[in-house]
Amino acid sequence: METCYCIEPQWPADELLMKYQYISDFFIALAYFSIPLELIYFVKKSAVFPYRWVLVQFGAFIVLCGATHLINLWTFTMHSRTVAVVMTTAKVLTAVVSCATALMLVHIIPDLLSVKTRELFLKNKAAELDREMGLIRTQEETGRHVRMLTHEIRSTLDRHTILKTTLVELGRTLALEECALWMPTRTGLELQLSYTLHQQNPVGYTVPINLPVISQVFSSNRAVKISPNSPVASLRPRAGRYVAGEVVAVRVPLLHLSNFQINDWPELSTKRYALMVLMLPSDSARQWRVHELELVEVVADQVAVALSHAAILEESMRARDPLMEQNVALDLARREAETANHARNDFLAVMNHEMRTPMHAIIALSSLLQETELTPEQRLMVETILKSSNLLATLINDVLDLSRLEDGSLQLDIGTFNLHAVFKEVLNLIKPVTLVKKLSLTLHLGLDLPVFAVGDEKRLMQAILNVVGNAVKFSKEGSISISAIVAKAETFREIRVPDFHPVPSDSHFYLRVQVKDTGSGISPQDIPKLFTKFAQTTVGPRNSCGSGLGLAICKRFVNLMEGHIWLESEGLGKGCTATFIVKLGIAEQSNESKLPFTSKIHENSIHTSFPGLKVLVMDDNGVSRSVTKGLLVHLGCEVTTAGSIEEFLRVVSQEHKVVFMDICTPGVDGYELAIRIREKFAKCHERPFMVVLTGNSDKVTKESCLRAGMDGLILKPVSIDKMRSVLSELIERRVLFETS
């Protein structure tokens, strides 16, 4: 009997397969049920997922698939009809849901693919933005380095410090192995190694400036990569075991240095450049980047500007010492000029007073002699003395006026005056001379010329008298015509003078005065000289007597009145035309302003004598005191004199109607004396009229007299006619005062 040692299996093969299917269906169902749970969890966490219904369908499909696998566990054995119905229902639902999901995916998948495309696009854009941000950061870093380097370079104006600082800062910022600067020699044919980063005193290597590599760099305004073996790049000895780093070179313009004589710099007749060479570390894979090259270019430009400023500073420092010496000399000359000017003014002030005092005696006594019985020969001599004295007084006035015009102390005395009366008075003053010389004298006043105007009456009359007087002086025969009109705007176009710019206005007008004569004429080349002080013509009859001050003073008066004066003549023997234009204000009211300070000379005075008028004269100069007393006695006045302040205060009384005093008195000046008189006579009608008799003709004296309460001012010298006119005016004012 055969024995079988076979081991019976624990489970039959069919049963084993069945168990595997059970287990597989169970895990499949478990997986199908877990997937929807995971989808639901992640969908709830996502706030922007756009396909929620698709996930619901897909989840239902998976759940139904899992359910079919779960139900299938009961179909491997005998099962009831109910299980079959459930299984069938589950499969039908699974089929429906799966088909619906499949149809939905047909529409969803393209969108999902486009989402992926947009994702890739966004990734590319993000990468591009990252690159741009990196570029911006690089540019910001470059800008920061440029600002830092510029600050370091501009922190000094010493050119050696500028160049050394540039190399040090570039080497630190760019981590350079070496940096050098080649400067052109004085001949301009070579470049010399002048500054390096690591060598304190580099050996003066030179290379020809016409090397191709140098020409290449100089012809470009950008940084240029050059060979490490180039002569300008061989800055340090290299062993053969390593590879040299990359080298760039850039030109440095030497701006405007040809204008400055810098001793050890090249003579730059044309545009020249220095050469800056920069070397990266050896045995490294580092290369020059774009922003580093831009940094080098910007720094080269900044170095050029800084060197230009340094050159300017060196030249200014070199020129400073001579300028300081000149300033010291100019300051000394200014002080000397001021001292001389003060001395001149003091001299003129003293001479003015001291010269007018004897002139006062001469003119006063001569005028007194004229009114006595004289033989024709004696009268002629007295008239000659009087005319010469008046001429000398005029010269004194001219010199003083010119002095004050030159130092700017003379100012116009503006007031309202009768313009027509000024011309008539000039005519009356000039007519006697023209009658003697048998000259025809005519005056034409424009119909539109205002009767009253605002300006300086005295200076205007002086200017007219100067011009007319010159015409009379240099005319032996013929005629002289004076015309005065309001200058129109079209006449200004004829005058082409840079300093004369008339501006029409409703508040002022321009007076045009023209004087024509048929006299000796002027050579054209002499016309410009006539407005220079002490200048006279050198040819022709105009080289006659005169101080040469009249037209010079007249021109300055016209300039003060914002006008212009000029002469015209066709030549010698053809006469002359003098024209001037001055600016005058338009008077608001047609009445002549009364200036209490100015004594006006009335030729036809109401009173020819003043019998019984008590007058007190105070003057420390005995001659002047006696002369003034003589004039007043001749006019019938009862005169009391005083030679000092004490005597004056002792004798002055209410009986005295007029007081003549000299303000230049030792001890107490006339201004303080006037104040004492006002204090002594409290009531105005008891106080005598106070008239200053002085040789000081400046405006300050007049203003001081006005502040002190003076009633009038008379300039020495004084003639008998002038004294008669002054007393007539004072008597009129006294009568008017008492009746008021």
UniProtKB/Swiss-Prot annotation:
One of its GO terms (biological process) is negative regulation of ethylene-activated signaling pathway. Residues 614-731 form the Response regulatory domain. Activation probably requires a transfer of a phosphate group between a His in the transmitter domain and an Asp of the receiver domain. The modification 4-aspartylphosphate is found at residue 662. Gene3D superfamilies: 1.10.287.130, 3.30.450.40, 3.40.50.2300, Histidine kinase-like ATPase, C-terminal domain (3.30.565.10). May act early in the ethylene signal transduction pathway, possibly as an ethylene receptor, or as a regulator of the pathway. Belongs to the ethylene receptor family. This is Ethylene receptor 1. It comes from Cucumis sativus.
